[in-house]
């Protein structure tokens, strides 16, 4: 049984999925077995009914969710991005499952866990990118501050270049330029 699980786990689309597969154990309860087999059959019908469907990304956000339970904690931008990816995947899967012609009632427990919050999803998209950088579009204040910093940076470079032009040529490197 363990070897079979290990083989199936190699096909998981995420580390979290792989861990869940490896944690499965046989059951002697006929009702549990029937329920699980029905769920697997419904999943197969879903995948076979939508040939171009592919598994959506499911980042492991357990750490971020754990942080969110602690008052005053702050997420790193990359964690926020990953939560946005999970929200997007959840919304899209929910739409695909609800829109399936068979209805797939066996997957009702999964559907109940899925979340759709487009406003939050869009807010996250405006706030951070896929590399975990906070974007100017995260807030108007941030955009103004960054624009002022860029302006100040340019002003300092111009001032240093003007000072550089007053230095005698014998002290200046031929390809010299000002960088900060």
Which role does the model predict for each range below?
Residues 1-149, 162:
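Conserved amphipathic alpha-helical "coupling/scaffold" segments
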Residues 142-180:
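Extended, Lys/Arg-enriched charged tracts that mediate electrostatic binding to polyanionic substrates
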